[in-house]
Amino acid sequence: MNIHPQHHYYLPAEWYPQSGIMLTWPHEHTDWKPYLQDITETYLRLAHTISLYESLLIATPHVEETKQQLKKRLSADQMSRIYLYEIDSDDTWARDHGPITLIATSPDRSHTVPQRLLNFNFNAWGKKFAYEKDNAINQQLYYAGAFNATIEDHSDFTLEGGAIESDGQGTILTTASCMLAPHRNQPLSRTEINAQLKRRLHAKRIVWLEHGHL
């Protein structure tokens, strides 16, 4: 890992302005198979709303089919903001298997610093389901030129995007039930995991919730 010391990288809050959204499209080999028509309709509505305002990156094993579905519902202007990549997946939870983005500005704010995409190991919430294809999506998208950013390999540490929240000021919120669950980062202790999260996410402190799920 080689972060320029003059640049303060941090994990932005959920409400921070964003340039785009990533979706992993449902298909017949996901758990959505019995409800594929209904869930595809939901994703088409998502794509319609997102593309009114910002870019949309879609990973799908059926690019042409997905494109035709979108073209029937979206305007040409909306379609110009959609980027399709032919990539297979186990499931659709891009929030969890997608890259975690760090942002930064130069000290004098004279220029924009490239974003850093953190590619963690994803193992379907502790090896509960198939995950090998989902775990490969970020690298495939990166090498296909989908991201206007550099990528950092954190595949030696298991973490999904839905396991953490940030206030954008250096505080990360997580839960003990998630981070200490089996088949994740054992044999690391809680203290060691805390240190790993701070270092990898450039955080000042980690707040652990002892109950509930995040």
Segments from the language model and where they lie:
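The feature marks the mature, well-folded catalytic cores of soluble enzymes
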Residues: M1-L214
